[in-house]
């Protein structure tokens, strides 16, 4: 997965509310408002970087943009995660009209059908690579 820290900082500096997930038992997540001084450490529920401290946010009821970590994505938006289902469960709760963006390297965008899919998998609308944003045919 590409490093999105610079983009997070740029969005924050522009006044955009940036939130990062914290893993909870049962493959659930809460969200914490991100700022440049927020401490990040490997989580205790899932072995991924997540916020230490910070208050959980009430998420908006209007559509939002969600950047999803991914190991791969195909041309129609099928996303391969790490298999925990955290993001798939969360995406089910998003307001209609929300946009899903898979953060991947350019060589992790595959032709249609080359990424394994399950019925519950979240499908991305865009792939965000270091080379730019690419619309997917979801």
Question: Could you describe each region identified by the protein language model?
Answer:
Residues 37, 52, 57, 61-66, ...:
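Surface-exposed, charge/polar-rich loops and edge strands
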Residues 1-61:
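N-terminal active-site beta-alpha-beta segment that forms phosphate/nucleotide-binding
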Residues 18, 66-68:
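Conserved alpha/beta enzyme-core scaffold
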Residues 1, 71-75:
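Short glycine-rich anion-binding loops that position phosphate/pyrophosphate groups of nucleotides
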Residues 20, 31, 80, 104-105:
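Aromatic-residue detector
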């Amino acid at each position: 997965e590409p490093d999105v820290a610079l983009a997070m900082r740029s969005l924050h500096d522009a006044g955009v509310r940036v939130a990062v997930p914290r893993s909870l038992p049962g493959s659930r997540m809460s969200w914490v408002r991100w700022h440049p001084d927020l401490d990040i450490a490997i989580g205790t529920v899932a072995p991924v970087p997540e916020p230490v401290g910070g208050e959980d946010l009430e998420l908006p009821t209007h559509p939002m943009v969600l950047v999803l970590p991914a190991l791969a994505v195909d041309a129609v938006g099928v996303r391969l995660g790490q298999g925990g289902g955290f993001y798939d469960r969360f995406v089910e709760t998003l307001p209609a009209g929300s946009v899903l963006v898979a953060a991947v390297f350019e060589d992790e965008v595959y032709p249609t059908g080359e990424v394994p899919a399950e019925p519950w998998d979240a499908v991305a609308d865009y792939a965000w690579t270091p080379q730019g944003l690419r619309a997917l045919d979801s």
